[in-house]
Amino acid sequence: MTWRMGPRFTMLLAMWLVCGSEPHPHATIRGSHGGRKVPLVSPDSSRPARFLRHTGRSRGIERSTLEEPNLQPLQRRRSVPVLRLARPTEPPARSDINGAAVRPEQRPAARGSPREMIRDEGSSARSRMLRFPSGSSSPNILASFAGKNRVWVISAPHASEGYYRLMMSLLKDDVYCELAERHIQQIVLFHQAGEEGGKVRRITSEGQILEQPLDPSLIPKLMSFLKLEKGKFGMVLLKKTLQVEERYPYPVRLEAMYEVIDQGPIRRIEKIRQKGFVQKCKASGVEGQVVAEGNDGGGGAGRPSLGSEKKKEDPRRAQVPPTRESRVKVLRKLAATAPALPQPPSTPRATTLPPAPATTVTRSTSRAVTVAARPMTTTAFPTTQRPWTPSPSHRPPTTTEVITARRPSVSENLYPPSRKDQHRERPQTTRRPSKATSLESFTNAPPTTISEPSTRAAGPGRFRDNRMDRREHGHRDPNVVPGPPKPAKEKPPKKKAQDKILSNEYEEKYDLSRPTASQLEDELQVGNVPLKKAKESKKHEKLEKPEKEKKKKMKNENADKLLKSEKQMKKSEKKSKQEKEKSKKKKGGKTEQDGYQKPTNKHFTQSPKKSVADLLGSFEGKRRLLLITAPKAENNMYVQQRDEYLESFCKMATRKISVITIFGPVNNSTMKIDHFQLDNEKPMRVVDDEDLVDQRLISELRKEYGMTYNDFFMVLTDVDLRVKQYYEVPITMKSVFDLIDTFQSRIKDMEKQKKEGIVCKEDKKQSLENFLSRFRWRRRLLVISAPNDEDWAYSQQLSALSGQACNFGLRHITILKLLGVGEEVGGVLELFPINGSSVVEREDVPAHLVKDIRNYFQVSPEYFSMLLVGKDGNVKSWYPSPMWSMVIVYDLIDSMQLRRQEMAIQQSLGMRCPEDEYAGYGYHSYHQGYQDGYQDDYRHHESYHHGYPY
């Protein structure tokens, strides 16, 4: 008995030891479900868990069917040495992968295990980005734009809302390159209950729009974060820092948004870096095309097209194989596109490779087999790239960039040929990026490795361009200034003598700007000749003999050397000085006859201010000056002021005003002089064309009147050339004329003009453009057209307008009445003071202008119609029938952005109208009136109103 019980006891002890050494399967499974990070071991044939996760998902293996039939064999294989096989970088693991790659095909279809999904989630932040690559379904959707893009959020109750449709109508196909150039991305939110939804509109560098649906659960979060009101249209413009830059409660023109963005300092840098961006974008030919994409959170709808794009790029990629490893990488990218194609084409791609070790070919083929049987998912990219990046720190940015990028950006980020195209555009960066591209062929580095060297190299490139610009300016400045003497030599009658004198002085003193000053002196003297003809004829007779002697001397100088000519010039100069001292009469004659020598003599002794004094001397006592500086001729403030004074040509002429305009920066300016004269006055010519670009003269003129800035600036002087008023912004010429009419010199002129019967008559017909430019950015127009003044609708509208002068004035409204049919037409313009006073100025509108205005606004003369024109010149609303109350019109105007700024200024100044004029809608009760009265009334006039910001 003892002998028989001995083996049994030994058997029991052995079984107890074996059972005690195995881990409990249920505990392991519970740990995985609880969220613990499990070892890198798969329960299937001791293969690494990461590879089995890919194959399991690709085959769709379900966890329940994977565990139950094979539970016991998997448990028997779990032992201590399995931890060594968990390292995916060891060579034995790769042989196991190759040997076991075909086994999942014999299994039933199911999903990957929950334990493996938890393992993927806990690996790194990269896995989260893979699940939410675009951010369209991620709660931190705005974080994907931070630091890179400006975000334009449009919120509306539903897609058929009036303001929303109007805003989308402004987004024509030709505006998206401008938006892309400013790095603007769009988010559209619909927040009405039951219709919640939205979309993310990403604008590519080619102007293409990639639309992705937005998770409806994110709408309330975004609405509360951006402080958008439910049930109302609203827009928010976010900076790149995700701070609110501007809010719009109504549709606005894109130019207004551009203006807000372009004021930022970062925008100036973007303009410099992106020169020619809009032209390249429009040349791509895809601007405004909308491409609908699915939500990338599950690797859905957008993937097949992404794979097809990579297929198109593959031939270019395969043409540049730098090493064997890069060729293998090409094969893997080809294999990644295989889901869109049948399985057989992947095999000839593997065979077309150049001769390589057998391990490389078998490894690439096994990858193709693994990926080809399933739709392409986000985990395929890290699998193919793992053997080529030994350090894991480089790999996550690459995979993140690949998955989060949209269709155009994939081709840019994955394939070096696009980067080489970029380097061809910037030749100065060819040195350092060449190293980066060679590195990319081995490691598939993230895009940041390429962008950093290129930006560093681009910096010196920009400075180098600036230095070249400086050198060009340096070479150009000496040539520009000596240029004027050449035409100056051709004008005087004494050509040879003048050429000789100028050349000698140039060689002796190296004064580059003297010829322009001498020519200026000559022009001033010639301009004074017709004023004293009788005296000058006598002076000519007295000075004929010395003139002949000097001509003989000048002829001899042409034959002599330069030294002799200089001596003779000095003698002639001494004689002229002596004659000056003897009599004042001879002085005037000398300046006229010897004018070609005296300016040069003066130039040696006179200070530089004398040239400015000579210029201003021609205006002193005769003309009033309006001096204007502007950065360029297209400057908005200058254009506004120019249009203003050009409309008042006759009034400028009667007040004897000359306008001197200086364009450009302080150190490189050009000048323009306009004289406003009556028909009976002789045309003035003060300076020659060469003097208009004389930098010394212009700089002295700037200093004389303190106009040393590059901004718009305007100075008004009287006939004594003393400053009477400075203007930093454009001003209406009526204000300028009122100021001039208070001058003592002007009062005398007015009395003289009345005696002589000088009356300002506008001979030319006023054009429509000039008429409308008078109100642009200054006044809003309320145009009322009727067939006659007895029309019922017209009379009803006039009764509604009575007593509204204060409200019209504070809102900068001008009423334009157009009456008549056929040839018997006419009009009246009513101007209301902007301070709210009841004084109204009326002007008659000629018949031809009435017809032009009706044609321009498409107004029929047969029927009553009224329309509101904003300060930007666009029609804001139409009224085919009379408005019994002006409340609706006022509310529409008060909702405009520019009007809100005006209201803030007027409130600070205490400017307001009595409440009874506005039926209880005073300024202090504006918000209540806007919400109570406007919302109800607006629905009845929704077909007429168009909300614009001006």
From Swiss-Prot:
Residues of the signal peptide: 1-21
Location of this chain's protein in the cell: Secreted, Extracellular space, Extracellular matrix
Region (Disordered) location: 28-64, 88-119, 289-609
Keywords: Coiled coil, Extracellular matrix, Isopeptide bond, Phosphoprotein, Secreted, Signal, Ubl conjugation
Signals that turn on the gene: Down-regulated in cancer and after osteoblastic differentiation. Up-regulated by dihydrotestosterone (DHT).
Superkingdom field: Eukaryota
Family: Belongs to the CCDC80 family.
Protein name: Coiled-coil domain-containing protein 80
Protein's organism: Homo sapiens (Human)
Gene this protein is translated from: CCDC80
